[in-house]
């Protein structure tokens, strides 16, 4: 089985109906539409009311199968990248598998925060090779609103909820290919972006860690990390592919902050016209951001078959992942 045999056959996305604007947040905390927009590029975000990570991911999986000539029983593998699962167990992927009736599928979750979807592309490829399987669904899904301190303007204004995904097939049909990848982890910087610290309530625990479920972030440290490591990762992946940045038709980057994306474009010496943005409408949706954006670009025919695209995620861990592919 060749690396080039892996194709994205379909894309899909799902998001809560409820929209929260910057002006609404300004009634809850010391902020304003102008303050948020200037610093992040975000105007509004989707926030779950009754939706869950598993329900949105199930919607994505259902859409993907409906776009194909497959049934749920033809799916061999389901992977979900998330840092905001419904439960620690069962996994979101197992819930999706049960919800859609994909009885033969292996299912597992991936926790690499905002890089999770790109890490997932690598892992799905390797799993299909190892198990000699054919059809996989990869989804990035998040309900980050449950990890937010809604009185903290430094984090509450940044994040949103949603899910996006792809149907991957290892087939020789001429519908694009994975070309190269670059994955990296800087665990020594992990303390600059944390969420979901649960502590240990056991009466036998001798070191009682604090219960701190909400996002905490050093914005300046994360910014510095991103604008250095993401261009390096993209350039390394392009070098493996024997391509230049100018030969990429579209850069599908994690939607963390408009300023970060603009700086990455500058570092690569590529026009912002090749860096589509949807953070203004969705905020930062972590592992869901790249597949949601990819689905929008495919549906709008901005990305077409044969286009060379660079997918890059970056964030908690701290982690970076880049995949170069021909769509």
Swiss-Prot record:
The keyword Lipid biosynthesis applies. GO terms for biological process: fatty acid biosynthetic process; secondary metabolite biosynthetic process. Its main location: cytoplasm. Keywords: Acyltransferase, Cytoplasm, Fatty acid biosynthesis, Fatty acid metabolism, Lipid biosynthesis, Lipid metabolism, Multifunctional enzyme, Transferase. It comes from the Bacteria. Residues 255-259 are annotated as: ACP-binding. Its EC number is 2.3.1.180. One of its GO terms (molecular function) is beta-ketoacyl-acyl-carrier-protein synthase III activity. SUPFAM superfamilies: Thiolase-like. Pathway: Lipid metabolism; fatty acid biosynthesis. CDD domains: KAS_III. GO terms for cellular component: cytoplasm. It is found in: Cytoplasm. InterPro entries: ACP_syn_III_C (IPR013747), ACP_syn_III_N (IPR013751), FabH (IPR004655), Thiolase-like (IPR016039). It catalyses: malonyl-[ACP] + acetyl-CoA + H(+) = 3-oxobutanoyl-[ACP] + CO2 + CoA. The active site is at residues 114, 254, 284. Catalyzes the condensation reaction of fatty acid synthesis by the addition to an acyl acceptor of two carbons from malonyl-ACP. Catalyzes the first condensation reaction which initiates fatty acid synthesis and may therefore play a role in governing the total rate of fatty acid production. Possesses both acetoacetyl-ACP synthase and acetyl transacylase activities. Its substrate specificity determines the biosynthesis of branched-chain and/or straight-chain of fatty acids. PANTHER family: 3-OXOACYL-[ACYL-CARRIER-PROTEIN] SYNTHASE 3, BETA-KETOACYL-[ACYL-CARRIER-PROTEIN] SYNTHASE III. Belongs to the thiolase-like superfamily. FabH family. Homodimer. The last Arg residue of the ACP-binding site is essential for the weak association between ACP/AcpP and FabH. This is Beta-ketoacyl-[acyl-carrier-protein] synthase III. It comes from Lactobacillus helveticus (strain DPC 4571). The gene is fabH.
């Amino acid at each position: 089985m060749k690396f080039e045999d892996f194709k994205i056959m379909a894309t899909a996305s799902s998001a809560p109906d409820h929209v929260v604007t910057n002006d609404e947040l300004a009634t809850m905390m010391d902020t304003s539409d102008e303050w948020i927009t200037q610093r992040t590029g975000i105007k509004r975000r989707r926030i779950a009311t009754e939706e869950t990570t598993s329900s949105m991911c199930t919607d994505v999986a259902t859409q993907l199968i409906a776009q194909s000539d497959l049934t749920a029983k033809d799916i061999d593998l389901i992977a979900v990248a998330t840092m905001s699962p419904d439960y620690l167990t069962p996994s979101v992927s197992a819930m999706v598998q049960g919800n859609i009736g994909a009885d033969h599928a292996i299912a597992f979750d991936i926790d690499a925060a905002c890089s999770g979807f790109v890490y997932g592309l690598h892992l799905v490829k390797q799993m299909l090779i190892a198990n000699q399987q054919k059809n996989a669904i990869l989804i990035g899904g998040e309900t980050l609103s449950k990890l937010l301190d809604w009185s903290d303007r430094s984090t509450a204004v940044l994040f949103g909820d949603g899910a996006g995904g792809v149907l991957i097939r290892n087939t020789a049909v001429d519908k694009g290919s994975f070309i190269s990848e670059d994955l990296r982890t800087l665990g020594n910087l992990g303390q600059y972006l944390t969420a979901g610290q649960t502590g240990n309530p056991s009466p036998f625990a001798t070191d009682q860690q604090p219960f701190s479920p909400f996002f905490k972030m050093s914005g300046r440290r994360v910014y510095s990390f991103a604008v250095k490591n993401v261009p390096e990762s993209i350039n390394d992946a392009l070098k493996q592919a024997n391509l230049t940045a100018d030969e990429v038709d579209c850069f599908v980057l994690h939607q963390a902050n408009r300023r970060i994306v603009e700086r990455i474009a500058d570092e690569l010496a590529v026009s912002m016209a090749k860096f589509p943005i949807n953070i203004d409408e969705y905020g930062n949706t972590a592992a869901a951001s790249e597949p949601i954006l990819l689905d929008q670009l495919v549906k709008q025919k901005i990305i077409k078959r044969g286009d060379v695209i660079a997918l890059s995620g970056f964030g908690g861990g701290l982690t970076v992942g880049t995949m170069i592919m021909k769509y």
